[in-house]
């Protein structure tokens, strides 16, 4: 059975999720984190997120291929109806439809939670380089997101300044 299965993440998934996340930390500007978190820290992040928001994994034949989660957009009470989503897919499984299934499932759960606004903060290069392409921008546009703002040169990684685009789901 080769069907992709979406399920709720568990803190015990931390090691497998870190295998997916670590290359993004060490070799890309997709995430602005400099150091790969420990397995304990990552499990703690999963637990903390799941106190209020969904955290999903995509698996096939028992192997986790990617994950996506929502988190608070801003800590102030008036933003309680807004979330920021993040997604990470195994590098060799990108463009296989996993991201689409994860996002669609996550968005459905968020709608059931009465979340009104779904945002993504997307690292975006002025021009593509070895650390960052516009693949995430293109993915989000295909998923119906639109760029609504820009934080110019807000992040410094690999001795380069990067811009982040804010996108919302139509």
Model-derived features: positions:
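A short beta-loop-alpha structural element at the N-terminal edge
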Residues: 5-17
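Helix-loop element at the rim of GNAT/NAT acetyltransferase active sites that forms part
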Residues: 19-36, 49
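Conserved catalytic-core motifs of GNAT/GCN5-like acyltransferases
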Residues: 69-72, 121-123, 137, 141-160
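A structural signal for short, well-ordered beta-strand segments
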Residues: 85, 118-120, 167
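Conserved small/polar residues in nucleotide/adenosyl-binding loops
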Residues: 162-170
């Amino acid at each position: 059975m080769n069907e992709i299965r979406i399920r709720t993440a568990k803190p015990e998934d931390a090691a497998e999720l870190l295998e997916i996340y670590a290359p993004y930390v060490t070799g890309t500007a997709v995430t602005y984190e400099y150091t790969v978190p420990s397995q304990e820290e990552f499990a703690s992040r999963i637990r903390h997120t799941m106190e209020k928001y969904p955290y999903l994994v995509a698996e096939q034949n028992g192997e986790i291929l990617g994950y996506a989660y929502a988190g608070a957009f801003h800590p102030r009470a008036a933003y309680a109806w807004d979330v920021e989503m993040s997604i990470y897919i195994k590098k060799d499984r990108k463009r296989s439809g996993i991201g689409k299934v994860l996002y669609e499932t996550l968005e459905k759960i968020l709608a059931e939670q009465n979340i009104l606004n779904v945002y993504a903060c997307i690292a975006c290069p002025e021009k593509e380089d070895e650390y960052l392409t516009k693949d995430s921008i293109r993915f989000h546009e295909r998923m119906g997101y639109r760029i609504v703002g820009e934080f110019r040169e807000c992040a410094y990684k690999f001795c380069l300044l990067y811009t982040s685009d804010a996108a919302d789901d139509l």
